Amino acid sequence: MEKSWFNLMFSKGELEYRGELSKAMDSFAPSEKTTISQDRFIYDMDKNFYGWGERSSYSNNVDLLVSSKDIRNFISDDTFFIRDSNKNSYSIYFDIKKQKFEIDNDLSDLEFFFYSYCSSSYLNNRSKGDNDLHYDPYIKDTKYNCTNHINSCIDSYFRSHICIDSHFLSDSKNSNENYIYNFICSESGKIRERKNYKIRTNRNRSNLISSKDFAITQNYNKLWIQCDNCYGLMYKKVKMNVCEQCGHYLKMSSSERIELSIDPGTWNPMDEDMVSADPIKFHSREEPYKNRIDSAQKTTGLTDAVQTGTGQLNGIPVALGVMDFQFMGGSMGSVVGEKITRLIEYATNQCLPLILVCSSGGARMQEGSLSLMQMAKISSVLCDYQSSQKLFYISILTSPTTGGVTASFGMLGDIIIAEPYAYIAFAGKRVIEQTLKKAVPEGSQAAESLLRKGLLDAIVPRNPLKGVLSELFQLHAFFPLTKNSIK
């Protein structure tokens, strides 16, 4: 590979740099005219040096290593010449095609030309006046942070071409350990480490950093979430999983919804130890039902697809059940039905208002008719709760709410509230189109369409939801335990 050296940058500080781009000199096309006020030199294919005064024809063909915009004019491999505080010299070379870093310690040829130029009489004897076009103020200014400047250029270049965030040349006591943290964006948009990405030295070919050292990214995945509509990043805790850029509503876990609605320190879960026993011994060639249950439990930390319990909402005691779509699609089996039934019976005995947050794909097919009978069982206890005891039940429909949940307790609330843009239906769009051989109109199963047709009472965003629920409860004579509990 032919090499062309240009743009020497150095200072009298602890670090000295030289930048290189591997590209033939005859392929350097003028990208834009630049005004050059610093003293620079060029090293061509015949290893001849030219100052800007001697070969002024290059002034329009070579850009300074000043910004990422200038670097982008040369799409090729990069090498940086470094001399650390311990007087050790080496270069970091990046091969774009192979995506590997290579640290080279054999720089005798480069050092010869570098120090020859630094000690030249032309450099030492030239004028330092204001009118001198060759005067470089950064050589005199030892406070100029060349390290940060180069790091910024490299970061911008790598981010714009191969989605790498790099932190080069850490100025530490052990300057030979210059760690390069690289985080490569996968197709799903999440940050992950590149498995085949290695850094090696020419001297001993030993790996300085391997893929195992990048567990840092896992810690940040808990703080940030990516919108699946516009792919923007947002902080989980502040935005309530609502994209601040496009307004798209992302899915929330049952624990997040409990935290959103219930006052801190007042949540008392019920029937946490209730698990499915595979009542019909469902057989599957792909994966046994018990294995799917175990896998979902490990992934979500839940025993089944619903959390039930009691707590306080702005000081008002309530009974709350929240379905979790991450647990087998929020499907309703015997455990889900039994937990919701027990919650309603407890709310009936204690005269508590009831909230059920629905997020489900329907009845769980692995439990057959036992899952279908949960629809009738829950509807039966709800009838006693609402009609006989005259208590107040609010149903909150989130995306998606379909199947047996929609056909039973999901649409039985005294007040039915939906989140914006929620997908609410009995049969899914694909099932309807395959059965009827007709296209389903776009948006006909969205919450906004159902509200216009009178199937919903209100569409409430997540931010004011807790306040709206509190006002509805007080309107129906459910008040806080103490006046000071209202926030």
From Swiss-Prot:
- SUPFAM superfamilies found in the cross-reference section: ClpP/crotonase
The entry's function note states: Component of the acetyl coenzyme A carboxylase (ACC) complex. Biotin carboxylase (BC) catalyzes the carboxylation of biotin on its carrier protein (BCCP) and then the CO(2) group is transferred by the transcarboxylase to acetyl-CoA to form malonyl-CoA.
What name is this protein filed under?
A: Acetyl-coenzyme A carboxylase carboxyl transferase subunit beta, chloroplastic
Q: Pathway, per UniProt?
A: Lipid metabolism; malonyl-CoA biosynthesis; malonyl-CoA from acetyl-CoA: step 1/1
Protein species of origin: Barbarea verna (Land cress)
**What are its E.C. numbers?**
2.1.3.15
**The reaction(s) this protein catalyses:** N(6)-carboxybiotinyl-L-lysyl-[protein] + acetyl-CoA = N(6)-biotinyl-L-lysyl-[protein] + malonyl-CoA
**What PANTHER family is this protein classified in?**
ACETYL-COENZYME A CARBOXYLASE CARBOXYL TRANSFERASE SUBUNIT BETA, CHLOROPLASTIC
Q: Name one Pfam family in it.
A: Carboxyl_trans
